[in-house]
Swiss-Prot record:
It comes from Mycoplasma genitalium (strain ATCC 33530 / DSM 19775 / NCTC 10195 / G37) (Mycoplasmoides genitalium). It comes from the Bacteria. Residues 8-28 form a coiled coil. GO terms for molecular function: DNA binding; RNA polymerase binding. This is Transcription elongation factor GreA. Belongs to the GreA/GreB family. Keywords: Coiled coil, DNA-binding, Transcription, Transcription regulation.
């Protein structure tokens, strides 16, 4: 697993494509219109509407460039990988673990950093938990380190998303 790659699921890739399309097709023209309206008001040196629209334009253009870079350098978690019987924890795996410290079962999907969302139990492949369980098998126990309070987990189940 190359840690510095932009790992994306097909779903995450499509979401970024959709966001990019919206920024280019909807947001960019909207800002251009707002800038023109602000210019039509006259003196730009003290025009708050123009300043706000110009700042918004900068944010949109920055996000467009960022998404284009992410998509150009993305490494997709392949459909083949998602359909293969999983024996080891890997990128795209959904893993059920037992956390000895909280005495509870938890389920996480390992995704690239850009798709990580703790509320949806999607953890980054660079997170301490993912690094601890990556490449492990069902039944393996391991310590999650690199955090303030290390803890121990046991892998109960590995499946594909």
């Amino acid at each position: 697993m190359e840690l510095n790659k932009n790992y994306l699921t097909q779903e995450g890739f499509k979401q970024l494509e959709k966001e990019l399309e919206n920024l280019i097709q909807v947001k960019r023209p909207e800002i251009i219109r707002l800038l023109q309206e602000a210019r039509d008001q006259g003196d730009l040196s003290e025009n708050a509407d123009y300043d706000a629209a110009k700042a918004q334009q900068g944010e949109i253009e920055t996000r467009i460039a960022e998404i284009q870079d992410i998509l150009a350098n993305a490494k997709l978690i392949s459909d083949h990988q998602a359909k293969t019987k999983v024996t080891k924890v890997s990128l795209g795996s959904t893993v059920e673990i037992y956390d000895y410290s909280s005495k509870s079962n938890e389920k996480y999907t390992i995704v690239g950093t850009l798709e990580a969302n703790p509320e949806e139990h999607k953890i980054s492949n660079e997170s301490p938990l993912a690094l601890a369980i990556y490449g492990r098998l069902i039944g393996d126990e391991c310590d999650v380190v690199g955090i303030e309070v290390p803890y121990r987990v046991k892998i109960l189940k590995i499946s594909n998303r």
